Structure formats: structure tokens, C-alpha cells
Amino acid sequence: MIQRPKGTNDIYGREAKIWKCVEAVIDQVMEKYNYNYIRTPIFESSELFHRGIGETTDIVTKETYDFVDRGDRHLSLRPEGTAGVCRSYIENKMYGDANQPVKVYYNGTMYRYERPGLGRNREFTQFGVECLGSDDEMMDAEVISFSYNILKELGLDVTVKINNLGSVEDRENYKKALVEYLTPHINDLCEDCQNRIKTNPLRILDCKVDDQSEILKNAPSILDYHSKESNDRFNKILTYLDYLDIDYEVDNTLVRGLDYYDYMVYELKLNDSLALGGGGRYNHLVKNLGGPEVPAVGFACGIERIINEMNDESFNNIDVYVMCVNDEEKIKANIITQDLRLNNIICETNVMGKSLKAQFKEADNMNAKNLIILNSEDLSKGLITVKDNVTKEEVKVPEDEIIDYILGVI
């Protein structure tokens, strides 16, 4: 038997229904914030991710799916969405559009060769937004509140963890101090961090190895290396978040795993541990990829992680289950279910030849709110029995009033 590749999933049944509901909420919120949908290729030139994400990042060095096609082109399955959006922005000269900033959102599959686990797959789905062209701190606050409000609307009580990485110059000064501090402790660091001290020292701050937590606790703070301009920018963002009533905490160890961020970075944390998404400002990425100097800010969230944390009890509900046994009842059930569906009522009926007892059980499994119980005796009198499946109360309704009655009780 051929099986799906490790780290991938089939989405069907109840889970597929939840996905559609989550994506509908995302689309509705995107529309309110006036973001336009964008689709970019699933695979791109490998150079795009090497230059965009960073040659020394774990994503590029360990996790990308790279291949050479029949035209001897080096390509990669996209591991994230921002680099592809920026490539499209440059290639299609969106920086010349009349309406600025350019505000776009995406929703699609990404690929990373990681050890599969809860909320972590090799094929996964992200939705995200990118706002290109504005350097205003109000735009940072909008992006943060945007992502925060989407998760709140999905019933997730998240906290924003936010940090100030400072300007490029600030970070370079801090890196030197961090390397100077860590070098005497190099043998006490994990193997990855021993490599990072030469290639990407800021990523050491995000290491999850407990044995070196004491070393990092005494490391220099990035706060001591911020310029006045960097601090002023960051404080403006926090002021906006206060006015917007966003629940946030400043976390000076937060760096994220992508090299293109500068100034503000943030993550959306659930229960102070699980990151459902995050983002930040990247004012130099477009230029690094061959475009003009364009400020930008964005975020991305993993849909699988969101769905894993949602209460999914309400997603398998139907409004009405129409019960029938014999041929006369089946014909009537067919007519009624069609009329209900034309009135946007979610309903189901017996198409498997089940007994009445089995249909009651099936209706309960579907969390049906109401039951329409067809029987020949009622139909001969022009009546239909309707049962409230919560209170268990039954009423007889004239057949020609059944749709109006159901519309009135759901």
C-alpha cells in the first residue's frame, strides 16, 4: 500500500470542516483590513531563500527541500512566504503602484525538513500578511493587532511577546559584545550554538538547551546597545498597542529564526509557551533581493498549530437531521432536505437504510439541534413531527409550514 510521505497529512471529515471555518475567518478579517490576496509559486530559485532568509539560518542549512530540475536550475520548495512575496513585489514593480503601501496576504503550503511532531510537519500551511512601503510605527501596531485579533476571533487567548532588535548598526555592535562574552564559554555551549557563535550569534539567545540557560542569563542585554532612534521607534509601537488594548510582554531574548528582521519582532504565544505565529519589520529585505530600498513589516501563522489548539466541538454540528425509513418517507425527506439547504440550513438524512434507532444515534453523533421525524401516519394527516434534540420536546407542524418553522427555531 502506498502511504503519504512522513510529515504530511490528509485533511478530511471534521478536520476539513474546521479548516474551512478557520480560512473563512481569515478571509473576513483580511477584507476588513483591506489586504489583497496574493499567490506565489510553491517552488522558487534556491538563491531567493539563501539571500532572503540567510545563508547561515537553520532553515537554509538544514531544512529546505532543494532540487535541480531538468534544465539544471537550482530550486527549493518554499519554507516560508515572505521572500516569495518580496520577489513578486520587485518583479512586478508593485513599488510603482498608485496605492501605497502595498498590503497583501497569502494562505498556502510551506515545506521544511524537520522532525515531525505536534504542530510541526514537513508540509504545513501558513497564512500571513506583508505590508510594503510604510515605515510608520502605526503600521507595525496594525500588523500586530491584526494577527492578535484573528486568533482572538478563533477563540485563542494569546499574548504578544515583542522585542526590539534595533537597527543594523545596533545589532552589529551587540553581536560583537555577545561573541566576546560567549567565547570563553564556547565548550559549555551545545554543538549548534558553537557553530552559531561564528555564523549567527543572535540565534544562541533562542536556544532551548537547558544546560546553557545560566550562561545566557548573564549575557549582555541587547537593550544596552540600542540607539535613541531604535528605542523611540519601539516605544511608539508599545504606546499604540496600549491604546489598542493588546495584551503584550517585552521579551529581550526573542530573536526569531530569520535573518531579515530588524527593529521590531514579535510572536503570538499561547499559555506562555507555544508560538502560533509571529513576524516583524524587515526594512532591508527588498533591497537585498535586488529591489529598491523599501520598508516593510509582516507576520505569518501556522494553521495546523491554530487548529490543534482550538475547541472543535461546535464544528461538527448540523441544524436538522431528517429521519425516514420507508420509500414514502424517503421521497418526502429528499424534498425537505433540498428545501432546507436552499434556505442555508445545514441538514442530513438517512441514505444508508438505517433503522430509526440507528438514525437517532447518528443524529446525536452529528450534534443535530433538531430532528424531523417522518412517519406515514403523520404524513397522511399533512403533519410532520419536529423534536428539539436538546430539550427533547416534540411538536406537530403542518407539512406546508415545516421550512418556516425550522427557520424560526434554529
Q: Where would I find each of the regions flagged by the language model?
A:
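TRNA-recognition modules of translation machinery and tRNA-sensing kinases, especially anticodon-binding
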Residues: M1-I410
